[in-house]
Amino acid sequence: MKRRIFTLSGILIGALTTLVSSPALALYEQARWFTLDNGMDVIVIENHRAPAVHARVVYKVGALDEAPGQFGIAHVLEHMMFRGSPAYHGRGLLPGQYDGELGRIGATDNASTSANVTSYYALMGSEHLELFIEMNAILMNGLTADSDQLENEKGVVLQEFRQRWENNPTARASHAMRAALRGASAYDHPIIGYEEDFLGLTSQDLLDFHADWYQPNNAALIVSGDVTPEDVLALARKHFGDFPAGDVPERIRPDAERAFEPGFETVTDALITKASARRAWRLPEVVAETGPEAFRSRYAARLLTSMLTSGLDAPFTRYLQTERQIALSAGFSIVLDEGQDWAMLNVDPVEGMDAVEVLDEAEDFLRNWLANDLTEDRLNRQKRRLMNGLVYAADSVDGPAGSFASLVASQSDYGVYLTLEDTIAGVTLDDVREIAALFLEQASQPRTLALEPLEE
């Protein structure tokens, strides 16, 4: 097939052009990006340290793409993909055959559904990569959607729903807080969906959803490990190349539809085993784009929170857990998510302490620390920790595949990895102070959530 040429960050790149030039992330220098004629992305990261590969097929569809009345369909479809597929290139899959064949060769496989993507992935010996690619091409071609199999999988999903959602008041309350922070109704439902919705799904519903979204031009094959780009491209062309590009529905990402409502809420439930509290603030928009400048701001926020909370010597840990001994754990995060930006503080108090009182003291310490104790030395230490973590992840079989899958999920420019080390190194103390000022000076009034066990 004819190779396409793309312009990325002002550099003309072809199918065999290096994506990452950072010496600290040497393995990312092996990353190659191809696009088949039908629009399917193929990303390959070479790592010949061990004769193994991590491969995943990522579809750009998730819970945010579901229609009202069908909440949970992306997750149910993920389950049903392993329950039989019609023949493609002369071969189909029986129920359980996908997992069975991967298990037979010693592979470990799984699948996951998120707000933005659905992924199918496996870790295996590199000599078995074609089997994974071949079977995932069969999955892309279609599913049997047998009604009896569907009813069985609904039962499995219902058990998950009861464990993760219905019988988990902490998860429900936390999800509601995050949905309120985002401000758009599309975030209100959990990824697993609602019982009345997923139990009402039909085989035709799943077939229609698959036909809409499981298209080559809405998918990426990502392979990391003991492979060559040329070999992976040949396998991708062999098994995925005959699919025509499809008409994929427009993905609508919701803007905030409602104002953030500050306030205080207490959730008391017999299923809550220990008290905790969290407090959240809506922040003004920092960056809406998904390119390198957005990554710079996000890494500034990440470095800021790491300076405060990472490690046993972290100021937050030392003050709340060692000096005051009032919390078992505590955390603070700032999330910059394309205009839906927020901060959250959470504490788990020691037994006998009031969770909200501990939360108040944690906030007082946080504000004082952000205003007075940000230093160049602390920033540089966290930069080194962050870079070390990225290097260690890059030197694993699955780490690079996960990194590129995250870019697919966020629809970010693949070029952000061209200058990743420079982006992190270039974060200044002023950048970090600017993020801190968002919280200290421009945040909304907070919303506080207290979770308490039901007293007998």
Positions of PLM-derived features:
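Bacterial N-terminal signal peptides
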Residues: 9-20
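Mature N-terminal segment immediately following signal peptide/propeptide cleavage
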Residues: 27-56
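Scaffold signal of the M16-like zinc-metallopeptidase fold and its non-catalytic homologs
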Residues: 84-85, 132, 139, 164-215, ...
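M16/insulysin-pitrilysin zinc metalloprotease superfamily fold
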Residues: 123-154, 311-312, 331, 335-393
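An aromatic/glycine/proline-enriched structural segment found at the starts
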Residues: 183, 191, 220-287, 452-456
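Non-catalytic, conformational "gating/processing" segments within enzyme and secreted inhibitor domains
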Residues: 154, 206-239, 444-445
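C-terminal regions of mature proteins
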Residues: 220-222, 289-290, 332, 346-348, ...
